[in-house]
């Protein structure tokens, strides 16, 4: 029982999002968690930035990074990566381990379209202007 609790505790640590404040406002070391994606049902809807969502653009939703920030998202299983602009807020569903929602185009680039979710690392590459 102790061993099981220890394993669950370690698993929880790896799924806990790292606040950007821990990196002086910039997630240089990265944030690890799960990415999901959103597409056609949201096409044309306004995002938190005021832009219209386009599933063909390389954009993403994040709960706390400033809108306009560019991040590199790396699929930890396949090592595929993409740079996206944060233009929306989320993810709001799917469980506590989710840290970013990718547009359909971005999800395709990192190879998570078919699986729906994947463990990723998110690293800020350019702060919002």
Protein language model features and the residues they cover:
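Secreted/periplasmic proteins
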Residues: 2-129
């Amino acid at each position: 029982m102790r061993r099981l609790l220890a394993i669950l505790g370690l698993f929880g640590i790896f799924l806990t999002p790292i606040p950007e404040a821990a990196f002086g406002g910039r997630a240089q070391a990265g944030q690890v968690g799960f990415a999901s994606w959103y597409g056609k049902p949201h096409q044309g809807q306004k995002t938190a930035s005021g832009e219209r969502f386009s599933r063909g653009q390389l954009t993403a939703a994040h709960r706390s990074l400033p809108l306009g920030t560019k991040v590199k998202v790396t699929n930890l299983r396949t090592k595929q990566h993409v740079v996206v602009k944060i233009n929306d807020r989320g993810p709001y569903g799917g469980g506590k381990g989710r840290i970013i929602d990718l547009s359909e185009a971005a999800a395709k680039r990192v190879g998570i379209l078919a699986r729906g979710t994947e463990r990723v690392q998110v690293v800020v590459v350019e702060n919002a202007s």
